[in-house]
């Protein structure tokens, strides 16, 4: 998926609000979810040992979230055996995203994936951060490969957890 495609998705689903305290909140998106960027993961955040930072602004961050979250739940027209499902990790603890078959960096320290943990309360906003492939599940990797989100080379790297 090219950046122009990502921007089209972003323009379709983006609703950005700014609260009185200048917090930015996006959504609800097509799944009805609200997204609130975590300032310590922002592209301009101070470098912290245990926090990854996005390579681009909050709009980009929300677009990446929507790649993982907004899906129809219906079979793909070109392959009715495969369902267009959210990119939930095998353990059910959150969503993963990858952009442009993993060719583009998402994080400032080389991360090519993003993780969006499920909020503790259903009404809470989502947030996410760039990450590596240490905890990604094989079923999700298989799904991405089956719908051509990733190439065979990236598929192999993800299964070995070296991306």
Regions found by a protein language model. Give the residues of each.
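Functional cores of ribonucleases/endoribonucleases
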Residues: 3-141, 145-159
């Amino acid at each position: 998926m090219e950046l122009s495609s990502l921007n089209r998705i972003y323009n379709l689903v983006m609703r950005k609000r700014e609260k009185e305290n200048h917090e930015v909140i996006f959504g609800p998106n097509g799944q009805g979810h609200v997204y609130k960027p975590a300032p310590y993961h922002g592209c301009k955040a101070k470098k912290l040992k245990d926090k990854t930072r996005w390579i681009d602004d909050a709009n980009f961050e929300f677009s990446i979230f929507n790649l993982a979250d907004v899906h129809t739940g219906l079979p793909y027209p070109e392959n009715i055996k495969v369902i267009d499902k959210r990119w939930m990790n095998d353990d059910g603890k959150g969503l993963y995203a990858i952009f442009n078959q993993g060719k583009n960096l998402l994080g400032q320290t080389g991360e090519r994936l993003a993780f969006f943990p499920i909020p503790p309360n259903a009404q809470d906003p989502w947030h996410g951060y760039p990450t590596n492939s240490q905890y990604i599940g094989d079923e999700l990797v298989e799904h991405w490969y089956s719908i051509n989100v990733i190439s065979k080379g990236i598929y192999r790297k993800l299964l070995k957890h070296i991306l």
